[in-house]
Amino acid sequence: MLAVSGLARSTFFDHQRRFDLPDKYADLKEQITTIVHDSNATFGYRRIWRALRNNNTIVNKKVVCRLMREQGLVSKIRRKKYNSYRGTVSHIADNVLGRRFIQDAPNKVWVSDVTEFRVAGTKVYLSPVMDLFDRTILAHTLSTSPNTQLTSRSLADAIAMFSPGKGLIVHTDQGFQYQHASWRTLIKSVGGVQSMSRKGNCYDNAVMENFFGHLKSEMYYGASFTSVDELCQAIDEYILWYNTYRLQERFKGLAPMQYRNQTLAKTLTV
């Protein structure tokens, strides 16, 4: 056979020896596959590398990338957006935030927005409130109507749970819900300051837009939901997972709530 193929005897046995060797990356491949599965295929190689490090598995990023490619493991990608702008209904606030998305402490700047889902011929709306310090979703509400109760309830819940101090900035777009007196009254009740993106400028609330992009690509697009309840449960579960498990490069590989708790623990020991 070797004579027919023209393959050198030494080359044949060298390849044969390699095939017979145990795969030195077998355990690592298994870990990577588990992380991909646990993250619902939302982690790219960088987050998987971080997760491995958090589990005390030290490996080069390039190795993780190569092994994922060899196993056909790819992360989901993203797609577009609900617009709640209805013109100037009441009050338009200044853009106090001014794209200062990096904050040095919790409860200094909160951002919010509304996004839309479709299931079984019905529209479902999500209103989350996020802390820019650690990107934690502090509270969220779901409804089949994008009314002022939807947005006010999520902000009221966040205030009740996290007790922000005076001077809190609450930033949104110019959606009609945020021009309403109920929203402005809630902000004033804690001595807060209202901030709004400039008209039609999604980059002024880019962090929340980014969260919506991740949420939809990671748990909604490509999935099959048969009812409003099923979709709402999946969104609730995703937000819990995002807060407690979704690793963030900017936070040295910690999930939002991990980073928040670590920061608060340091503050208490000072």
Predicted regions and their residues:
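K/E-rich alpha-helical interaction surfaces of small helical-bundle regulatory domains
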Residues: 1-19, 58, 234-254
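RNase H-like two-metal-ion nuclease catalytic core shared by retroviral integrases
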Residues: 86-88, 172-174, 180-181, 196-216, ...
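Generic alpha-helical secondary structure signal
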Residues: 4-11, 27, 182, 189, ...
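C-terminal domain-tail junction helix/linker
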Residues: 188, 214-270
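An active-site-proximal beta-strand-loop segment
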Residues: 99, 103-138, 144-146
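Active-site beta-loop-alpha junctions of metal-dependent nucleic acid enzymes
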Residues: 122, 141-163, 169
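Mobile genetic element proteins and their domesticated derivatives, centered on retroelements
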Residues: 1-5, 12, 32, 48, ...
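Basic, flexible linker segments flanking DNA-binding modules
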Residues: 9-105, 201, 257-264
